[in-house]
Swiss-Prot record:
Keywords assigned by UniProt, alphabetized: Cytoplasm
HAMAP family assigned: UPF0291
Organism superkingdom: Bacteria
Family, per entry: Belongs to the UPF0291 family.
Subcellular location: Cytoplasm
Gene Ontology annotations for the cellular component aspect, listed alphabetically: cytoplasm
Record InterPro entries: DUF896
Coiled-coil residues: none
Main location group: cytoplasm
Organism listed in the record: Lactococcus lactis subsp. cremoris (strain SK11)
Protein name, as recorded: UPF0291 protein LACR_1198
Length: 80
């Protein structure tokens, strides 16, 4: 799930309101939901970036990408 700029703005708005005056029960639930969505989005983006890495040995020029990562890349159609 990707998070929109509007959702990030809403997270910040709720955080400011929480500091200033507190949140209702519904707002607390909305804040928890939006925070979880944001964290899930960050994790998914990070995983996607890591899964595309190819590690090359500086001295030999040989591909030394860990086998586990190579297997994930093969599964996703990024390797032969």
């Amino acid at each position: 799930m990707t998070i929109t700029n509007e959702q990030v703005e809403r997270i910040n708005e709720l955080a400011r309101k929480k500091k200033a005056e507190g949140l209702s029960e519904a707002e607390l639930e909305e804040q928890a939901f939006l925070r979880r969505a944001y964290l899930d989005s960050v994790k998914a983006n990070f995983r996607s970036q890591v899964e595309t890495i190819k590690v090359i040995d500086e001295k030999t020029g040989e591909d030394v990408t860990p086998d586990k990562l190579k297997e994930i890349q093969r599964k996703n159609g990024m390797r032969d």
